[in-house]
Amino acid sequence: MEPRTPAEWKTLFESEAFARQTEYYGPLGVEYTPAGTHLRLWAPTAKQAAVNLYRRGTGGACVGTLPLQQQDKGVWSIYLPGDQHGKYYDFTLTTPFGTCNAADPYARSAGVNGVRSMIFDPARVDPQGWERDVRPVIPPARRSVWEVNVRDFSQDPASGVHTAWRGKFLAFTQQGTTLSSDGIHPTCLNYLKRLGVSYVQLMPIFDFGSVDESRPLTRQYNWGYDPTNFNVPEGSYSSDPTRGEVRVRECKQMIAALHAAGIGVVMDVVYNHMYRSDNVLNRAVPLYYFRQNADGSLSNGSGCGNEFASERPMARRYLIDSVLYWAREYHIDGFRFDLMGLYDVETMNLLRAELDKLPGGRDILMYGEPWQGGCSALHRYEANKNNLNMLNERIGIFCDNTRDAIKGGCFDAREPGYVEGRPGSFWDIGASVAAWCRSEKLPPHAPGQIISYVSAHDNFTLWDKLLMVRYARPEFAAVDKTALAQNRLAAGIYLTSMGLPFWQAGEEFARTKKGQGNSYRSSPALNRLDWHRAEQFHSLVDYYRGLIGLRAAFPRLGALDKASPAAIEFFPLEQPLVGWRLPAQWGDGAAWSALCVYYNPTETAQVVTLPGGSWKLLSDGISSSLWRGSSRICTGQTVLLPLSATVFGQV
């Protein structure tokens, strides 16, 4: 008997009988050859299915409608003879819920706004030389992640990027850009190469629904956490969203340019929900891909009206297929999972195992937000912070414990953290240094599971937070010396801590959003990187640059083994000072035999006694590049500057 209510459909979809009858692991989507194209769609609840063909990605009449043939396991298919490159299509499906048109869930490109899917020959679409693109080899000691939105990266008129490329994938390909083309102050890719970051994390680049690709972008803006087509690049980031091949080619050009600069690409993926409940997955198989409450209603742990049912077999397959597609086809170097707590542990571990099977796959990063956006109907083990020890040791999490310990809670603008003088927070600073491997609050397998950070796209920028803690009516555009020192101290803590360091683009030049804590659809002007600030705060940029280099020169800070956090020796200092020593690992090429690090969050100088031996001053609260020259050798007592992270190397 056919189900009649959402609750009955939930019972059916979660039954072993349905899984046996419909689990399918053959090809889906487009299988193109010049001689002909196979189309395959998994739609087990459909009663009829047809494909509609178009010459254009938007507008124009349908040039043919052909019935699909029903196969085993809920698959519908058709073979289209002849070269179909450049054709667009959608499906007309009749299910117990009615008749509708649907794009292909496995579409690899699309027309405007992702409504029509596209058939294309990858060999004719790939940029020149794509077959020679390779992922850069980035050892753990050099890993650091810089998070940016494609629009924000180059939207500033002073970015030096060609006007037509601003806010686009192609902005990442332009070489030698400088501030207002002055030939002096680097911007965009030129800036990243000088800064020394090893990975760029791109906020969502797959097709999202909150920006209308058919309209000018002047007043449109959204971060893109509202997916429409999971395997299709976003059209508004391309130079021509009407032609599906352009978004594919230009996305790959961006990735190739970053790889050529030695920078890996981390993709921010948002499989946990879709833009609307009426979406490509729900049209193909109504209700199947989305988690349901006991009464059959859609669970809303994402806070966006729906959440992906990763525990259902074909939904799990879809997620894994999609990630593997981006890894193989686009040479993606890492994946950041939005609201990872909405996925089950089993799915995440299976995905990690599948990535590991790819050539170089064990080096592909995988991490996510270990929380949810609301109450979820997921009743298996969630991939969240509480279950960290159930996840593969190479699946990491954003450590909000570290974030809040350093700068204060993110939900209360006035709540201070360690760098602003919060009493008692030094305990969590010590735990952060050891990537929480020596704390009972978190159960990581190894330090590599911890993302050490203080700012990301969510919540206040670090600069805004520092000013809002200190002042009732902050002047965000002002050059505040205390906030600058606190900013340097915050960076000095997480960039000398174990784990994977991560920061929001522009944190290193005091990025401000004028106190706006959730700018996901604010103006492009508020969100874009202000490249003038990179020049104005060049000394802060240089401080980050020096710490990145210092960290790479002492590989044990990026160690992935649990023995390394255990080797940290913490000093018994007067609160709130924190001090520690870490010996280098034999044979790792470290520039110094040990590091000795002190954090002083007070606004007065402090005197400490160094461990025995001779110590070279590598970094203090003003300069983090002393290690590059012949800085002074210290023994015995030394003075820590106010609001400073001070680093010594044993010689």
Name the predicted role of every residue range:
Residues M1-P34, H38, Q70-Q174:
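The feature marks proteins involved in alpha-glucan
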Residues Q21-G26, I493-Q516, L526-L595:
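Glycan-recognition and catalytic regions of carbohydrate-active enzymes
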Residues E31-K47, A567-P611:
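Carbohydrate-binding surface patches
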Residues L41, K47-T58, C62, A605-I622:
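Beta-strand-rich binding/interaction modules
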Residues A43, H85-Y89, S630-V651:
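C-terminal beta-strand-rich structural cap/linker in extracellular carbohydrate-active enzymes
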Residues L53-V75, L618-C634:
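Solvent-exposed beta-strand/loop surfaces of large extracellular or lumenal domains
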Residues F120, R352-A353, K357-F509, Q516-Y520, ...:
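Conserved alpha/beta catalytic core and glycan-binding cleft of carbohydrate-active enzymes
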Residues R151-Y330, R336-P359, L365, A377:
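Substrate-binding/active-site clefts of carbohydrate-active enzymes
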